[in-house]
Amino acid sequence: MTENAYRNPLDIVTEGRTLPEGYDSWGIKSIGFDGKTRKGFEWPAPGNETQYYELLDHNSSCPRQIGDGLCVGTTWKGMASGGFRAFCLLLVAYRSIEARSDEVGKLRVPQAFVVARLDGERLARESFRGANLHGADLHGADLHGADLHGADLHG
């Protein structure tokens, strides 16, 4: 891999980790500091599964109503689509055979296992050095104090 090659942050976060029994794929979820997402859904603590939801008959990555599954990201862009910033993150596992998706980077699942709660800012500082930001939309980003030495900001 070249120095500036893109590497999905989810691959970095899951490196060396083992999926929980019965699960075959990793996902990432941004949540509020209170552990909740849209419409007040409260995610369980690490080491626990969410309730199982019957998915409605559509392939959308997003639930159409409460009880129509959970939206999980497989990329940072997909994770951020729920409107929560990457401060408080959950590393989750899901069963790929149950996932529905019509967008790259995010999907809808009937159940997820919460593996870990992550500090998004700390993770970025410690693990994402040398990130290739080619084409990144940084509109509105607070870059005060950011060390962008060597960052590829072309685009």
Predicted stretch roles:
Residues 1-155:
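Short, glycine-biased loop/turn motifs at secondary-structure junctions and
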